[in-house]
């Protein structure tokens, strides 16, 4: 049985359950396009937190997952998979984005299991853990939802990212929204 379930619909539409909206993003502090832009419009305080993290930690965020409260809906967290240094036309190669997606999902898997971060940067770990304390409930109680990450602005063919998601079939189940 697959750990990926596809549905058609708008990922940003309100739901009656706890969920983490996962997206891939750059470490340059720009939620300027795609789902990231839509998240910024809907959850501006979350974007402020993201920008602050990027300004303070930059490329040290690559391959990490940071879970940010939406600040506008207690049932929504935003899972940022840092897969590229820059966004837009300056993003990394498809291979590096897929590799960083795998690393970020591995980091996310650790967060789900322990609700704490372990990396080579103690200050970044403290920030990640501080943000985790702002949520209500346990991370494992949240459904994991995403668009077809990496396939928009980053230009990675969806099957490449899909293969990475399948690697986490023992610990994570994803609902992927298609338009």
Swiss-Prot record:
Domain (Macro): residue spans on this chain: 1-179
Enzyme class: hydrolase
UniProt keyword list: Hydrolase, Protein phosphatase
Gene Ontology MF term list: ADP-ribosyl-[dinitrogen reductase] hydrolase activity; phosphoprotein phosphatase activity
PANTHER family in the cross-refs: ADP-RIBOSE GLYCOHYDROLASE OARD1, PROTEIN C6ORF130
Stated role: Highly specific phosphatase involved in the metabolism of ADP-ribose 1''-phosphate (Appr1p) which is produced as a consequence of tRNA splicing.
The protein, known as: ADP-ribose 1''-phosphate phosphatase
Provenance organism: Candida glabrata (strain ATCC 2001 / BCRC 20586 / JCM 3761 / NBRC 0622 / NRRL Y-65 / CBS 138)
């Amino acid at each position: 049985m697959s750990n990926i379930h596809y549905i058609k619909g708008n990922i940003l539409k309100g739901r009656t359950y706890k969920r983490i909206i996962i997206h891939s993003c750059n470490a340059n502090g720009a939620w300027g396009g795609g789902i990231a832009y839509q998240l910024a419009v809907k959850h501006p305080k979350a974007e402020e937190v993201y920008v602050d993290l990027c300004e303070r930690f930059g490329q040290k965020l690559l391959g990490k997952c940071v879970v940010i409260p939406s600040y506008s809906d207690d049932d929504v967290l935003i899972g940022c998979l840092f897969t590229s240094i820059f966004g837009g036309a300056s993003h990394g190669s498809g291979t590096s984005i897929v590799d960083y997606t795998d690393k970020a999902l591995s980091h996310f898997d650790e967060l789900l299991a322990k609700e704490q971060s372990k990396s080579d940067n103690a200050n970044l770990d403290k920030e990640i853990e501080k943000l985790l304390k702002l949520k209500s409930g346990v991370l494992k109680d949240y459904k994991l939802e995403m668009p077809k990450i990496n396939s928009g602005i980053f230009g990675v063919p969806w099957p490449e990212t899909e293969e990475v998601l399948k690697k986490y079939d023992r610990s994570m189940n994803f609902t992927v929204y298609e338009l």
